[in-house]
């Protein structure tokens, strides 16, 4: 057993890559620890900086999970964002699903905004709230 808990807990708080992808989709990318103060870590994911708490003693490079629906996509440059290019765009019922090329590899993003549609080849900026970045133990 990789992890026990309710489906909601497994989805929102995966402990490793297997669990992160077992229930739903997750973007698993590497993050570099650039600073540590007590149990507060500063992580760098491509051009984006994230502050996250962890009671674990983390190595210099960690894997993190970014859920597709937690990633915000925007045409306007954000101060703290990942630069990306739309690779595919698909309308799926009540949302758009995008696959993007970025400095951390391919990222999968789901947007509920069906009015502001991004086109293949378009340059965009991705951001995520610090609390939505989940450190994985592998």
PLM regions and their residue ranges:
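Internal alpha/beta loop-helix hairpins
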Residues: 1-48
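Non-catalytic connector elements of ABC transporters
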Residues: 26-28, 36-138
């Amino acid at each position: 057993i990789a992890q026990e808990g309710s489906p909601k807990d497994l989805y929102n708080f995966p402990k490793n890559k297997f669990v992160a992808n077992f229930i739903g989709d997750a973007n698993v990318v590497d993050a570099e620890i650039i600073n540590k103060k007590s149990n507060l870590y500063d992580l760098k994911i491509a051009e984006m900086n994230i502050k996250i708490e962890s009671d674990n003693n983390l190595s210099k490079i960690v894997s993190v999970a970014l859920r597709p629906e937690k990633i915000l996509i925007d045409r306007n440059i954000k101060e703290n964002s990942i630069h990306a290019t739309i690779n595919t765009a698909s309308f799926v019922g009540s949302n758009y699903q995008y696959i993007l090329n970025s400095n951390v590899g391919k990222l999968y993003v789901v947007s509920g905004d069906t009015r502001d549609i991004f086109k293949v080849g378009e340059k965009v900026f991705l951001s995520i709230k610090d609390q939505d970045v989940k450190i994985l133990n592998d």
